Amino acid sequence: MLELFPSEDVSPLYFEQRLSRQGYRRIAGIDEAGRGPLAGPVVAAAVVLPPVFDLPGLNDSKKISAKLREKLFPQIRRQALDYGIGLASAQEVDGLNVLQATLLAMRRALDRLAQPADYLLVDGITPVPLPLPQKTLKQGDSRSLSIAAASVLAKVVRDRLMTTYDARFPEYGFAGHKGYGSAAHRAAIARLGPCPLHRATFRGVREYL
C-alpha cells in the first residue's frame, strides 16, 4: 500500500498494533541511511519489534544525538525479535542509481532476517520490490517505532563504517562528515581527486574524475 501524504498524527505504534490485530506477527520496519552522501555505501536495516519493549528515546535517528543512537543500538538489537542489515556499495549506487541501490540494500537487509517478515513498513514512498504486503510511510521514521528502530541501526552501522574507512583514507576526513558534502570534504576531493569510496556519478565528485 502506497501512502503519498502523511495522515494526522497518531501513536508511533498505531500501524504495528493495527497490523497485529489483522493477524500479522512479523512486521518489519525498514529504513536506510546514506542516500545523499558523496562517498560510502547506502545502509539499510529491517527490524521486527516484539509486542512489548522498552526503548526510551527511540525516534527518527536523524533527530536524536549520536550519543543516544549509540546507546539505543545494542538495546534495539537485544530486544528486537529479529533484525537484518544490508549494504549497497558506492559502485552499486553508480551502476544502478541511488534509489535502486537503496532498494537493493533493503532487500539484503530483509534477507538477513532469521525468519521472513510477513508485513513491511517502509520509510518513504517507494515500496520494496518483493511479493510481500507492505505500506510505505512518508516520514515513517517519526511515525512508526519499527521504522525508527531500523533508522537507528542503519545510521549507527553506516557511521561506524565511515569511521573505519577514515583509517584507510584519512586525508578525506570521513570520520567527521561521514561522506556528506561538507565544505571540507568538497575541498579534499578538489585537492586530491576521488577515492574508491566516492560515488562517481554524483555532482561534486564526477567533476574531478
Curated annotation (Swiss-Prot):
Belongs to the RNase HII family. It catalyses: Endonucleolytic cleavage to 5'-phosphomonoester. This is Ribonuclease HII. Pfam families: RNase_HII. Residues 25-209 form the RNase H type-2 domain. GO terms for cellular component: cytoplasm; ribonuclease H2 complex. It is found in: Cytoplasm. NCBIfam families: PRK00015.1-1, PRK00015.1-3. Keywords: Cytoplasm, Endonuclease, Hydrolase, Manganese, Metal-binding, Nuclease. The lineage of its organism: Bacteria, Pseudomonadati, Thermodesulfobacteriota, Desulfuromonadia, Desulfuromonadales. The keyword Transferase does not apply. Its EC number is 3.1.26.4. GO terms for molecular function: manganese ion binding; RNA binding; RNA-DNA hybrid ribonuclease activity. InterPro entries: RNase_HII, RNase_HII/HIII, RNase_HII/HIII_dom, RNaseH-like_sf, RNaseH_sf. A divalent metal cation binds at D31, E32, D123. GO terms for biological process: DNA replication, removal of RNA primer; mismatch repair. Endonuclease that specifically degrades the RNA of RNA-DNA hybrids. Its cofactor is Mn(2+); Mg(2+). It is an enzyme of class 3 (hydrolase).
